[in-house]
Regions:
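Active-site acidic/histidine proton-transfer and metal-coordination neighborhood
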Residues: 6, 10, 15-107, 116
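Histidine-acidic metal/acid-base catalytic patches
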Residues: 32-33, 38-40, 57, 86-203
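Aromatic-lined substrate-binding rim segments of carbohydrate-active enzymes
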Residues: 1-5
């Protein structure tokens, strides 16, 4: 795995599904794995911090200790939005801190998930991007038709990518992003190339 990542411009790791629960020991193991493959960022779902329902509460002290541990390993944590998760991201930033440079914990805006959300007005993707612009450290890019989390190639769904690129430019985002495309109808490389082409045409 480490050899496969050697020539990549950057490496990000998504927390593995079997660890999708709040367990600081397992989270540290994932941080160690990320560090071992040279990943600069570890993307975690809210459930990995114990946040599923509005009544759930962060173990603030332990989350901060985990984030500090990640910093010693050269890994930044990024909490990814799921559908309708403004309340979650706001809570994390309110209780842990809004500056990733200080907390070593930022936001990964998943554009596809934002497109499915109903908690952010008529243009949810742009709302998520603008709302978390100062805390964004990573992006997940994929498309869908606004109904299911399809992880389509860019341009195959209903996301307005021109508007996405314009919003990111206006926000001054200069961080990393990753294509999160499933399948590509049997031609995954073509799906990736087409998605890159969509972005290049809008740059």
């Amino acid at each position: 795995m480490q050899a496969a990542c050697t020539d990549a411009p950057f490496v990000s790791v998504h927390m593995r599904g079997r660890y999708w629960n709040w367990n600081p020991v397992n989270l540290r193991k994932e941080i160690d794995f990320a560090a071992a493959v040279g990943a600069q960022k570890l993307v975690i779902h809210p459930i990995c911090l114990g946040l599923v329902d509005p009544d759930d509460r962060l173990e603030v002290g332990e989350v901060r200790r985990v984030a500090d541990y990640a910093a010693t390993r050269g890994v930044r944590l990024a909490v990814e939005n799921v559908k309708d998760s403004i309340w979650i991201l706001d809570r994390v930033l309110d209780e842990i801190g809004v500056d990733p440079e200080e907390t070593n914990l930022g936001i990964c805006v998943d554009v596809g998930h934002a497109h499915l959300s109903r908690d952010a007005g008529r243009n949810p993707v742009c709302e998520y991007l603008e709302r978390y612009a100062n805390a964004m450290v990573h992006l997940h890019l994929h498309d869908n038709a606004g109904v299911r989390d399809e992880h389509l190639a860019l341009g195959e769904g209903t996301i307005d990518w021109r508007r996405v690129v314009g919003t990111l430019t206006a926000c001054g985002y200069a961080g990393t992003s990753a294509l999160e495309i499933h399948g590509g109808e049997g031609a995954p490389l073509a799906a990736i190339e087409n998605s890159v082409g969509v972005l290049q045409a809008l740059a």
